[in-house]
Amino acid sequence: AFLLAATLTISSHMQEAGAVKFDIKNQCGYTVWAAGLPGGGKRLDQGQTWTVNLAAGTASARFWGRTGCTFDASGKGSCQTGDCGRQLSCTVSGAVPATLAEYTQSDQDY
């Protein structure tokens, strides 16, 4: 089973004018195909980091890990966990099973 907290480190940093940067690092002993909406997707071998820059005004984002993936040179393929429409670069949410992290930015302070 894939556990996001145990395998990927996700850190966020506020940038100029409300833009946000996420650094997603694979701390697993195996390859993970990270996915994000918005953001797409990227293969991460052990120790690799994927930086996702979200534009100012992006209200929300979600990130998850995919395992057991195979993709061809055009980015078409599939994953055993977290598959997102048989694409390397996700444009739809991942299928279960998947553990994800969500980010929402608003002016509400609770």
From Swiss-Prot:
Keyword field: Allergen, Pathogenesis-related protein, Plant defense, Signal
Superkingdom = Eukaryota
List the SUPFAM superfamilies: Osmotin, thaumatin-like protein (SSF49870)
For the biological process aspect of GO, one term held by this record is: defense response
Any Pfam family from its record, for instance, is: Thaumatin
Q: Residues of the signal sequence?
A: 1-19
The record's comment on protein family reads: Belongs to the thaumatin family.
Q: What is this protein called?
A: Pathogenesis-related protein
The source organism is Juniperus virginiana
